[in-house]
């Protein structure tokens, strides 16, 4: 037999990154996650809720948290992680995965991140890993997460003092935004979210920029109507970019304005010591 070289190509359909569509709901109502999710009444789709110690103690979360005795409510479970950037680690991500495994979750179930960018990023990353992919939803509780971090599918965690070094593009199937969470933020986190929103205005939206220019006093006073408008504009602007370039090969790279220097500064200062939007 003569020597031959043959090739075989395997053709793949586009891989669905968690969901084909992300539904974003904006609500001016007081957050009532018991009414939204009805813990213990999952309707056949179990939920793994993930939050942090700070969010879990908010007054608007008290009723929801109380439903989970010993971390479970019916077939649903609740995981409360440490708060802030120091806990944005692969160990925290694997803690979510481990709890879902121990509770017998399947690929048809759901992970729900309730918190700021750290919780949303880690919950989404854990969802992408669990059984090679489970759906996720987010309830962002910081302004930064509402205008940026929860939107667009970037998930991950820090690793060896490198910010967001490992992760996956895994968009949430639904994002529920309650701007009222903003009133519970410390000033530094509120300012951080405004910084991210201003960046979006500078890049893509003159109307958004004009809000910062003309309504600065209302923003500084956290006027609810003004903040609601800023959040909706940022979400819409980012959605348009992500629809064109989910995996950041082109136009989405513009959203990294300030991030190269900013991430380096955060790393040198010690992750968590400087707010991301600062």
Range-by-range predicted roles:
Residues 102-108, 131-139, 269-278:
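Phosphate-handling active-site elements
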